[in-house]
């Protein structure tokens, strides 16, 4: 094998008309791409680990940490050039390629990649010891500043990863070297933890959680943020062993609240509770607008109101300080975002529900204020709407019956997953405190945004397929696009609407112009039910989430095309018998089948309406929720 061919040798090897895949379009990958394009040497498809959105090349699109089978699906190549510096990525992609018939001498490695942070140039090596030395040197040159560029942090994250996996003895050396720069240490530890989480390796995650739990008390702000980021990243995985992490995450929360609320330690008396009062904890972790949090807390509150309960929503922003830098989801103050969030969604909440926003910038102040205000409300029950995503419940579950949502996730992703509910079997305390999950009842509003196809330049009699999601840039991959393209080539009056964060240059790469003209991309806002009423089929990508999007579509009588392997994702509401075996070819084949048979299409639409109606009775859900609260209280009082 050409172990270290280098850029020049690679260019000499690649002759005209060769098909080349470049993994990692940064640094040397960009240089390779440019030279190949300038010399018109072959067809290039370039992938970037994270920063492809910063590139303007036609053949580059963003594929953040996708599995190799997703990256290479539908592609053909003669050479693969691994420009990435990540040892793990090289190892995994090489393994995949060789298992699928690529000869070893057709897999080329960059000998080294340099990084320039504007002040100094650093070189990265596969040797962990050299990498550690480079990290330390870089840190010294930057004089301990922890506001590093995102690229540089990712650079270090990769090498912490390789050190921990391949030669763990180096991790202690690095932590010792960083002892005077603890914020930088925590920041990189976070990056490492998230990378491990994405790699779905439970043993490594537990090891990292052990390091995190050892961080000193003065780093409580970072501990607090780590808890949220860990839970958020868990929500994007469907194979994580949640039961192996749940206890550690609770331990992290308890450490945070014990530091911030030290005067509460050792309390044993139970606070006074007023019958019929329910406090609902709502940590704000999403953007203002329609989201799982909006739909869930409003439905919980409304259904309990109809059961005669006195409900109060406690809105708890998860991070309000700009000092968190890129680790927070916004540079704006979260109190302001919270006000926007509530204002945007107040009409969905029953007028009998009271709302209080906890507006404190200091974490200790925020947690203590939240606990004080909830205690003053004297609730009979507490509902943690995000299942321990709010650290307040890590204190209050000792003093109140706390009902948890049946998932460890922070977003819609996985909220309806049976697999997650099953994972709680290890803990009888939590399994007995799960909120029953309905299909939410959404009031049908008059069409106001897209009430006729002329608004979108689509002929009225067209067959319309729709795909919706907040993360479509990573969910709609080349395999789905190419499969849909084949169907649309045959069906000239078929249109495809994509609602979400699609980037045409990256996600819809290489599509014929005629097909491209029949694709519409919309922002994720506006009257989605009105849009759905104009659609024939909801096409669900191979993903874990999509639950609320599918729910809205079903209510409007849209046929659902989803894969059976996504049964534990948003598609669980459809029913196993309605899902498709196989992959994208079979999925898009089902869309074509619905196109070819108007009778089957109408029958399927009507069945979706019926399923939706059967599962959307808010009164039945409210009754079930009250029963769950009573069972939770009984368990709490018995000390289970």
Task: Explain the meaning of each model-derived region.
Residues 290-300, 436-511:
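Conserved catalytic-core segment of nucleotide-activated headgroup transferases in glycan assembly
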Residues 349-354, 505-525:
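Nucleotide-activated donor-binding/catalytic signature segment of Leloir-type glycosyltransferases, i.e.
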Residues 582, 596-636:
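A charged, aromatic-enriched C-terminal amphipathic alpha-helix characteristic of glycosyltransferases
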Residues 374, 525, 530-535:
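Short alpha-helical donor nucleotide-sugar binding micro-motif in glycosyltransferases
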């Amino acid at each position: 094998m050409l172990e270290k061919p280098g850029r020049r040798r690679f260019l000499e090897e690649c002759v005209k008309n060769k098909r080349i895949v470049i993994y990692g379009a940064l640094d040397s990958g960009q240089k390779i791409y440019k030279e190949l394009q300038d010399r018109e040497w072959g067809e290039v498809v370039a992938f970037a680990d994270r920063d492809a959105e910063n590139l303007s090349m036609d053949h580059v699109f963003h594929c953040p940490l996708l599995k190799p089978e997703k990256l290479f699906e539908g592609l053909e190549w003669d050479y693969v050039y691994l420009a990435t510096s990540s040892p793990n990525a090289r190892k995994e992609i090489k393994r995949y390629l060789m298992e699928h018939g690529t000869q070893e001498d057709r897999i080329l490695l960059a000998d080294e990649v340099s990084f320039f942070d504007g002040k100094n140039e650093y070189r990265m090596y596969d040797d962990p010891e050299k990498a550690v030395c480079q990290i330390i040197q870089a840190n010294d040159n930057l004089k301990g500043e922890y506001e590093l560029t995102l690229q540089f942090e990712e650079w270090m994250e990769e090498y912490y990863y390789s050190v921990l996996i391949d030669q763990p003895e180096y991790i202690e050396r690095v932590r010792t070297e960083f002892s005077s720069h603890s914020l930088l240490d925590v920041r990189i530890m976070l990056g490492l933890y998230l990378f491990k989480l994405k790699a779905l390796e439970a043993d490594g995650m537990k090891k990292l959680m052990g390091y995190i739990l050892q961080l000193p008390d003065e780093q409580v702000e970072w501990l607090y943020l780590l808890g949220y980021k860990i839970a958020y990243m868990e929500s994007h995985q469907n194979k994580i062993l949640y039961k192996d992490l749940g206890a550690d995450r609770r331990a992290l929360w308890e450490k945070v609240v014990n530091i911030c609320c030290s005067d509460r330690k050792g309390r044993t008396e139970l606070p006074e509770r007023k019958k019929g009062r329910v406090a609902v904890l709502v940590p704000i972790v999403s953007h203002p607008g329609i989201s799982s949090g909006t739909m869930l807390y409003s439905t919980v509150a409304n259904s309990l109101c109809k059961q005669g309960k006195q409900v109060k929503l406690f809105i708890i922003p998860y991070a309000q300080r700009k000092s968190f830098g890129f680790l927070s989801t916004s540079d704006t103050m979260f109190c302001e975002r919270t006000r926007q969030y509530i204002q945007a969604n107040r009409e969905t909440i029953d007028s009998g529900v009271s709302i209080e926003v906890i507006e404190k910038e200091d974490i200790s102040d925020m947690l203590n204020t939240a606990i004080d205000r909830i205690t003053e409300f004297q609730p009979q029950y507490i509902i943690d709407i995000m299942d321990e995503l709010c650290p307040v419940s890590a204190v209050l579950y000792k003093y109140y019956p706390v009902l948890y949502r049946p998932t460890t996730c922070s977003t819609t992703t996985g909220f309806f997953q049976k697999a997650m509910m099953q994972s709680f079997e290890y803990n009888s305390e939590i399994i007995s405190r799960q909120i029953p999950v309905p299909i939410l009842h959404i009031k049908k509003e008059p069409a106001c945004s897209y009430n006729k196809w002329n608004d979108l330049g689509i002929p009225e009699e067209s067959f319309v397929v729709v795909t919706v999601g907040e993360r479509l840039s990573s969910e709609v991959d080349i395999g789905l696009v190419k499969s849909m393209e084949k169907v649309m080539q045959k069906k000239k009056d078929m249109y495809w609407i994509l609602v979400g964060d699609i980037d045409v240059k990256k996600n819809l790469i290489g599509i014929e112009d005629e097909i491209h003209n029949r694709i519409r991309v919309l922002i994720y806002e506006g009257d989605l039910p009105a849009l759905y009423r104009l659609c024939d089929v909801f096409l669900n990508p191979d993903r874990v989430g999509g639950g609320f999007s599918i729910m809205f579509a079903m209510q409007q009588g849209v046929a659902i095309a989803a894969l059976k392997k996504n049964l534990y994702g948003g598609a669980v509401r459809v029913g196993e018998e309605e899902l498709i075996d196989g992959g994208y070819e079979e999925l898009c084949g089902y869309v074509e089948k619905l196109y070819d048979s108007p009778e089957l299409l109408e029958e399927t639409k009507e069945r979706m309406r019926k399923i939706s109606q059967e599962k959307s009775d808010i009164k039945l859900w409210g009754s079930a929720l009250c029963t769950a609260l009573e069972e939770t209280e009984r368990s709490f009082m018995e000390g289970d």
